[in-house]
Each structure stands twice: as C-alpha cells, then as structure tokens.
C-alpha cells in the first residue's frame, strides 16, 4: 500500500487519523501500533509476523542490555540475529548464485519475497541495541512505545531510519513534543502534498521514459537515447525517494511525531562526499556512526581510512540490493571518496563552483547507470554505448521514447531538484516553514494536490523505488 495509492490516501490514512484523535491520549500509542501492524500486514502476513518477531527480540534484548554488566556478547548476538533474518530474505539467493557460478548446482537458489521495510527497521533495531549497549540511551520499558518507535507506518516502509535518542521524547502521547497544533497539522499537509506531487506528477512520469529505454537492449539504442533514459532515471530516483520522505514527514506531523530530514538537495553537491551528506541522510549517518567510526573512521592512517571507506560503501551498495551491480555501485563511490580524500578534493576546491558541481553530477550520473540498469552487463553496455557514441539500430527515434510533455517534465525536474530553491531562498523557507501557508501558498498546494490526485485516481502511480530495498 504505497503512500500515493488510493487505498492509503482515501481510506487508511483518514481512518487511522480519525481513530487516533477520537481515542484518549493514553490509548493513542496502542492505536498507532495497531494501524502500523495492519499497514505491514496489508503487504503480507509473513512480513508482519517477521516484524513482530524482531520487535519482540530487540525489545527484550534492549531490556537485557540495560541490566547486564557485560553487554558485548548479547549485543553481538542481537546484531547477528537481526542480520541473519535480513540476510535470509534478501541475500540468500544472491549468495547461492555467486557460489553456483564457481561450483554449478552446489546450492539451491532461494528467492523469498522481501518483507516490506525489513532493511530499514532491522537497521533501526541494530542502532537501538548499539546505543543501549553504549549507554547513550536507556532501554525502552514499554513494548507499545517500542513498537511505535520501530514500526510506525510513517517511516517503517522506507525510512527515514530513526534513532531512539531522537524519538524517545515523542513516544509519550501526553508530552508537549507530541502536541499537534493547527500550524503543525498544516505543515504536515504541506509536506504530504509536496511529496505526492514529486511522486505522482514528476517521478512517475519520468519513469515512463526510463522504462521504455531500459526495456530495449542497450547495444541497439543510439547514444542520445541512452543519455535521455538514464538522465530520466537519475531525476526519477530523486523525486521518487525525496517525495516519499516528504510524505513520511508529513504523516508523522499528523500524529505529533517529527521525523528526521532525509534529503538536502543532493544534486546541488560539489563533491561526492558532499552528495552523501545530502542524500539519504539517515542511511549515510547510520553507516558513519555504526560501521565507519567503529572501524576507526578517519582517525587512522590514510591507507586504513580508505579501506574503511571501501568497506562502508561496499556495504552501502549491498544494502540497496542483492546483486553485483549494487556492490560495484557502492565500491565506485568508495573509490571516488578515497580519491577525494587523497587530494582530489583540495584540487577541486581551486576550481569555480560550477565546475565542481558538473564534476559531481557527471560522476553521479555514470554510477547511477550501473545502479539503475537491468543488470551489471547491461549497465556496462550502456556506458560503452555512450563513450563510443554509438549510432544504434535504425528506427529508434527520440519521439518513440519521450513526447514533448515528458521532455518538459524532465527539464522542469532539473530546475526543481534544488536550483530554483537555491536561487529563491524565500521559496525554500516557505516550503519548510512549520506554519500554515500563505493564501498564495495555499493556492499552489491546492493545484498540486489536484494534479497529484488526478494521477493517483487515474491509476498511473507506481510503488516507491525504495520499497524494494
């Protein structure tokens, strides 16, 4: 049940809000936990059962970590249990295929359906247990509060990956931080509508271009069409995921739960390192705090620091998908970050901002070809076709892949991914102001809502890309 679906917007969300606000405060967390479980059960009963199991294990584990004098053995056990569940569903087939490539037929290839949100709430649970073991937070005593923290349907499906230390003050329905004022509710509506517009009006339309290009073997397509298709994918990926994140933040505000920002206009970055500080911020910061720093971070010698970066980004790529193209995507980013740390960043700082920005965008685009292609070999074929500027087979024209409307949406996406907001600081401030919009802003939101709902009710929406991760 995508946030941009008819079922969610017209049934699930209004019903959950109505029941939540009609109940007394002491019962509201139970209502929120129940609706969150129903949300996950809609995607599959097995997935909901896995969620309940992991929630129980990590809640009990957190309680035990808070009491034991020697916490490390239990922490390792909890992390291994969480990763075993994630690995069994997400990576077992990939591992078997890799082994079978060397010893054919040795292992059965299992491909169980990945439970909704598993990659996200497993990382949330690991972070919670690690923080309890480190003494950064106290363990949560109330299982309902823990369920709301771990699996609130606003962030459970695709993040942001939340931290208990940030969320704990909001887990009490009677607290001041949980109070929803009129301005806060209006802010939630604004973020929900903006996210819906990003998804339904821009991302889903750009997906039409990419889907057509990706459905044709890269070796047969002219280079300009390959560039068009994967440029559309790059913009689709941003508007799809940042649109989801906006909707998640808006939904959280309705219930008095503030979720962390996950994007800060990443396509405005002037280095790949800066890009990762702006893109999927909750995942990047999770890997920084729970993998990179424990490995030694940047406190080590330069050679070890680079090794740490390669490990972290190989894992980051693997988190995104169980395929070698995802590992290669992560390693490429790790290599680029190593180069920036070895001196490239200092050299770039001598260049005008425009050149640094172009350097970043071009490298991102090239690596996203690997990430977004139907497979690693196809991604390499795309890059080969572009670098050799191949003519492709006859009969493939631009008009067959994108009409004027889609090209205009693609052009608009370049402006709206951050450039307009950077040029108009007042617009950026208005978009993120936690208060009711002005009359002009309200009119704009109504137009976006109308256009977004037109797409939704027409059945032209698709699942969010990050739901598959």
Which residues does each predicted region cover?
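Membrane-embedded transmembrane alpha-helical bundles that form the catalytic cores
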Residues: 1-468
């Amino acid at each position: 049940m995508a946030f941009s679906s008819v079922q969610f917007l017209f049934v699930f969300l209004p019903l959950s809000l109505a029941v939540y606000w009609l109940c007394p405060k002491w019962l509201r967390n139970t209502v929120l936990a129940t609706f969150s479980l129903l949300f996950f059960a809609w995607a599959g009963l097995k997935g909901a059962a896995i969620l309940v199991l992991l929630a129980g294990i990590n809640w009990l584990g957190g309680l035990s970590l808070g009491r034991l004098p020697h916490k490390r053995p239990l922490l390792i056990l909890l992390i291994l249990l969480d990763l075993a569940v994630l690995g069994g569903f997400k990576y077992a087939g990939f591992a078997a295929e890799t082994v079978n490539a060397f010893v054919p037929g040795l292992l059965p290839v299992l491909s169980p359906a990945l439970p909704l949100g598993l990659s996200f709430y497993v990382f949330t649970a690991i972070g919670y247990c690690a923080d309890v073991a480190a003494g950064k937070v106290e363990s949560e005593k109330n299982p309902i509060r823990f369920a709301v923290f771990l699996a609130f349907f606003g962030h459970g499906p695709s993040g942001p990956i939340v931290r208990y230390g940030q969320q704990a003050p909001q887990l009490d329905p009677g607290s001041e931080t949980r109070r929803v004022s009129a301005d806060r509710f209006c802010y939630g509506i604004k973020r929900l509508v903006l996210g819906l517009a990003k998804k339904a009006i821009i991302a889903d339309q750009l997906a039409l271009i990419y889907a057509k290009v990706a459905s044709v073997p890269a070796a047969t397509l002219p280079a300009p069409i390959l560039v068009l298709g994967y440029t559309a994918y790059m913009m689709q990926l941003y508007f799809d995921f940042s649109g989801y994140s906006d909707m998640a933040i808006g939904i959280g505000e309705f219930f008095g739960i503030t979720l962390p920002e996950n994007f800060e206009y990443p396509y405005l970055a002037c280095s790949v390192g800066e890009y990762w500080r702006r893109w999927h911020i909750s995942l990047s910061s999770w890997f920084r705090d729970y993998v990179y720093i424990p490995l030694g971070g940047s406190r080590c010698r330069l050679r070890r620091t680079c090794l740490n970066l390669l490990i972290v980004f190989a894992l980051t790529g693997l988190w995104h998908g169980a395929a070698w193209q995802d590992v290669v995507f992560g390693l490429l980013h790790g290599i680029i970050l190593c180069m920036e740390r070895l001196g490239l960043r200092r050299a770039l700082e001598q260049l005008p901002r425009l050149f640094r920005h172009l350097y970043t965008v071009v490298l991102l685009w090239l690596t996203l070809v690997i990430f977004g292609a139907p497979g690693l070999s196809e991604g390499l074929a795309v890059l080969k076709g572009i670098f050799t500027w191949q003519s492709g087979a006859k009969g493939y024209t631009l008009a067959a892949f994108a009409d004027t409307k889609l090209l205009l949406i693609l052009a608009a996406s370049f402006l709206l991914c951050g450039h307009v907001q950077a040029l108009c600081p007042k617009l950026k401030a208005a978009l993120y102001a936690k208060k009711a919009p002005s009359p002009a802003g309200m009119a704009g939101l109504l137009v976006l809502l109308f256009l977004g709902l037109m797409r939704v009710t027409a059945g032209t929406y698709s699942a969010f890309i990050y739901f598959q991760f």
